[in-house]
Amino acid sequence: MAPLRGPTRASTSGISSQSREGTPPPLPPRPQLGNLPSRPSTSYSIRKAPSRPQLVSKATTQLSLSTGQAFGTESRDDAASIATKQRSFLGANLHSHSTSDADDSASIRSYMPGTEGVGEGESILGEVLGHEQKTDTEKTLLRSLGHKFGDGEAQSMFPPDPQFDAAFNREFDEVDEMSVDGSNEEAVMRQWRAKLKHFLILSSAGKPIYSRHGDDQLITNYIGVVQTIISFYQSTNDVLRGFTAGDVRFVVMSKGPLNLVAITRLPESDSQLRTQLEALYMQILSTLTLPSLERMFAARANYDLRRPLQGTDTLLSALADGFTRGSSSTLLSALECLKLRKSHRTTINNTLLKTRSENLLYGLIVASGKLVSVVRPKKHSLHPGDLHLIFNMLFEAGSVKAGGGENWIPLCLPGFNNTGYLYMYVSFLNLEHPTEQMQERPSTSEGAPDEVAILLISAEKESFFELRSMRDDLVETLQRNGSIEAMRAAVRQGRPKCTDIVPGSPLRHFLYKSRGNVQFTMPSFEPYFENALDKRRLLNLYNKLHSNVHNKPTTLKVHHETGTSCIALAWSTPLFELYAVAPAATSRAALAQSANKIIQTKLPSREKMNSFYGTLRLLSREFAPCPLPRSSHTESCKWQLNVRHIHANQYLSNWNAAGAQTFSHQSPTQSPWVCIDWIGRYLDEARSKVTQSATMPSGPLGRRVISPDEVRLYPHSCVQEA
């Protein structure tokens, strides 16, 4: 066969050449692995273009990017869970900008493609406690380009995705009605299929009850298909929980005579979708109660539930749209509270207690969808799901808004008691003139940003006038002691920015949840996430972080995610959860320090210490050999030359001052060192209740060690790498 003529393809080094007389040019010589320079510690370092193919011969802490392999190697973990795998929409890659398609969060070490087994592996988060080395040229160039970034990083936090942007912007548009002759059927079906998310509610007999998009004529065929699949599994004494079709995820939840289905192209896990379906089910129970629902279907299996639910479509649609836009409250199953000084909140709480009426069950003050204060009976707490329903009714749906300043609403709170009704008195305050009754509220679903509502809930049906009198006394007292003015200032101030909470922080946004209080807080979305699309993208990232941390059987406590445009951290302990996002140029050390400062501002001092003790096993990747002579150690420490230590500062010093001085040493550099064996022994003896989760596996002669499988980063300023 005659040799091929013409230009040859570009080689791996990017150098193109022309063939000479039909003979391909010779390939460059293969470089020796031992002579290759090591890659810098960050994938964002600036390098000169190589003149020949270069291989990486040293392990690196950076993961390979799935969207563009720098070395032409594609590695995927086909066993990635459904909850974390990427989904696409109409060809658009909808990923949360993770460093890999694989679930690398469960591993300790990561390597660049083609370098497995070469060199010693590094911790996936190791450089948080290390020091990144940059050449003088890199530092000079980065400083010269610094003025070009600034707040412009807000536009590059997430890469553009025109198809997803267009689909999301049309997500909340109503689907056209199908004409009588069916001439526009194809166009209507395209509109329906283009929606990113659907919620369907149907009876066990297959009768449609609710659909977020489309009328009965449009969804009847789909309802029939879904019911057939569910019935097939039920006939085999099995339960259908979910399935995937192409890039669409279906999640099914059966609740007595009802089947609820979530259909989504958004990156959400099954557990997150089930939480949303549970909220829709609770919304139905808040109208009917569980005994009424069961009685209706016991009498007739094909009962049409749309008649008793008539008028509640607005509430269901408001919930569904909130889930599609992204709801931090639903994701964390927690409530957001209005930021107030402790003295102001104490005054409001005392005022509620002093003015409460005899038949009051729950009393709440809510401002702009955030909880200000609540009074309740002992041993009777309000379920977060119940409060979500109330807030959705007041601040999202339009049903209560049409009633003006006060309303008397019978409703069922399923989390409190799903068998009966309570009665809620709702009064909206005019902050400019609190004693005057508000005559008319905004008719839009958005409402006013500074709305304040007083909610008084009673089990007595005839207590309307009693609760109204309590409301008048409450408002008068709040105005007299200055609480109205404090709430007005807090509402108008809004959420603080990240830099207001942590000055100089590179964070763009974060979510912090207090597990014990079932509350969360977050900074303002502005100026980096101002529109609904940017907020949805941010929630996509939070969804993935939340899924990676909480999906069983993993036991992750710290999860780090790196992408081409952002870097994120998820941190979960028995006391709190933290999710933080920063631009990709942010170092892991800066991200960890900012996360630690947030914890310091949110946790009380005692909880900070407990968190430190309880997460000793989440320490850094490597610890230096002990600088002290062997004779200075306990007998158990002498059995291994390379004894591991931790280096701590003020927290450990304070702990030592409290009575553990005998367990500390000073290194030749005057840095505090504490042997892990001694810490483990002391914690087992003196802090056993606090440190049950921190107990380390026993080595020879009972010496406590940290095995490689347990190495995780603990991003706290009081723990540093030696």
UniProtKB/Swiss-Prot annotation:
InterPro entries attached here? FUZ/MON1/HPS1_longin_1, FUZ/MON1/HPS1_longin_2, FUZ/MON1/HPS1_longin_3, Mon1
Record keywords: Autophagy, Endosome, Membrane, Protein transport, Transport, Vacuole
Keyword Membrane part of the UniProt annotation: yes
Cellular compartment(s): Endosome, Multivesicular body membrane; Prevacuolar compartment membrane; Vacuole membrane
Pfam families the UniProt entry points to:
Fuz_longin_1, Fuz_longin_2, Fuz_longin_3
One GO cellular component term of this record is: Mon1-Ccz1 complex
Q: Where is the composition biased (Polar residues)?
A: 9-21
Provide one Gene Ontology biological process annotation. protein targeting to vacuole
Q: How does it sit in the membrane?
A: Peripheral membrane protein
Disordered, as annotated region? 1-58
Q: Give the domain of life.
A: Eukaryota
Keyword Membrane among UniProt keywords? yes
Q: What does this protein do?
A: In complex with CCZ1, is required for multiple vacuole delivery pathways including the cytoplasm to vacuole transport (Cvt), autophagy, pexophagy and endocytosis. The MON1-CCZ1 complex acts at the fusion of vesicles with the vacuole, through its regulation of the SNARE complex during the coordinated priming and docking stages of fusion, and particularly at the stage of tethering/docking.
**Protein family membership:** Belongs to the MON1/SAND family.
Official protein name in the record? Vacuolar fusion protein MON1
Organism of origin is Phaeosphaeria nodorum (strain SN15 / ATCC MYA-4574 / FGSC 10173) (Glume blotch fungus)
What taxonomic classification does the UniProt entry list for its organism? Eukaryota, Fungi, Dikarya, Ascomycota, Pezizomycotina
Name the gene: MON1
